[in-house]
Regions:
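Intrinsically disordered, low-complexity proline-rich regions
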Residues: 129-132, 137-140
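Domain-level signal for soluble alpha/beta catalytic cores
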Residues: 1-129, 143-364
């Protein structure tokens, strides 16, 4: 199901360079060409850090996204964006993110923005051949030893969480909003596949956060209908976590409420948050690995303890007691956007080095 055992990957996001955050606060001083250069440089920086770490799978670090899912609302017509955070002071938390009003039927005539992001990543990641300046076609085969390029898209249920229901428009609750957003996300996935994307993560952290109080079978139905037209055409991953806005969780950090229902997700790789939970419920990777590749969150993005390669190797050996090497993938617990870049860089390097130690032990 993947290129080799004990694959190393990331969830999607990566810390913004300090200069990008400063520039984003002064975008009115930049022209269109300046902004293009700014984003290209930010993606190249995130990409270089991932390549230096030696990852098997890399992303653009979501350098165009203010937040994993918040930036997508700028592409959706029919909503009035919140003008300000509802709470400015005090400890950082999820309640500092407000919700957008739905004022018209929800549409996305320009897509959700992930295709241009993916094409930029492709352009920056693939080296020129024979010093040619000609662009590499999007459907070209991967170059030898080149990393897999992954895109990430929020699922419709997670996207619906930041919208206010509007019964007058036929959106009385979050479920109705989810159904309206589902075809928009599905079309975005189809467009990514058409652009040559060979791996995409359809992330529904809200499902894992609220599985304890909602019917998990309903979540399975939503997820599978979202990805049904790209199943078998690209590697579909999903990420189950408990929230990481400002490094804060929002749901009870237990996997049990999701299973066994989530085993019916029609994905090729399922990622579970483990490191921040001291690998509680690790035995659940056994049924996951029977169904698809089990991606393990093996470094804690909420902690500034830098896991050593030996730490990583010990954790991998624990995982091998529950799943075979050819079904295991290793990643951070969540996206790295809420982790300082200096720490993110070292954590990724140590993760890859730890994986390589175990590969050598296993002879794979």
């Amino acid at each position: 199901m993947k290129d080799h055992p004990l694959r190393t990957t990331v969830i999607g996001s990566y810390p913004f360079p300090g200069w990008l955050e400063f520039a984003c606060a002064h975008l009115d001083q930049f022209g269109e060409a300046d902004r293009t250069e700014l984003i290209d440089d930010a993606v190249a920086t995130a990409l270089r850090d991932q390549l230096d770490a030696g990852l098997d799978v890399v992303t653009d670090g979501e350098q165009t996204r203010l937040d994993f899912n918040l930036s997508f609302y700028g592409f959706i017509q029919g909503i009035e964006l919140e003008s300000a955070s509802p709470r400015h002071f005090g400890p950082p938390a999820h309640d500092q993110r407000g919700k957008h009003r739905v004022i018209a039927p929800l549409t996305a005539p320009r897509g959700l923005g992930t295709v241009p992001d993916y094409l930029r990543l492709q352009r920056l990641a693939l080296p020129p051949i024979s010093h040619s300046l000609l662009p590499i076609p999007s459907h070209s085969l991967p170059l030898p030893n080149s990393p897999t390029l992954k895109a990430s898209v929020p699922g419709p249920y997670t996207l619906a969480g930041r919208l206010l229901p509007n019964p007058d428009l036929g959106y009385p609750d979050r479920w109705a909003l989810t159904e309206a957003l589902l075809p928009l996300v599905r079309r975005e996935l189809e467009a990514l596949v058409a652009a040559g994307c060979r791996e995409v993560s359809v992330d529904e952290p809200s499902m894992s956060c609220y599985a304890y109080k909602e019917d998990p079978r309903r979540f399975v139905d939503i997820f599978n209908r979202t990805i049904e037209t790209v199943t078998g055409r690209t590697r579909v991953c999903t990420h189950l976590c408990f929230g990481n806005y400002k490094a804060r969780a929002v749901g009870p950090r237990q996997l049990a409420p999701m299973f066994p229902a989530f085993l019916d997700f029609k994905c090729d790789e399922m990622h579970v948050e483990m490191a921040s939970r001291e690998f509680a419920e690790l035995e659940l990777i056994t049924p996951i690995a029977r169904r698809c590749d089990a991606a393990i969150g093996i470094i804690d993005v909420k902690s500034y303890y830098l896991e050593t390669p030996d730490d990583i190797a010990r954790r991998i050996r624990r995982c091998l007691a529950f799943a075979p090497a050819d079904r295991l993938v290793f990643a951070p617990d969540c996206g790295l956007s809420q982790t300082a870049r200096w720490a993110a860089k070292q954590k990724l390097k140590n993760m890859v080095e730890g994986v390589r130690k175990v590969r050598k032990e296993l002879g794979v």
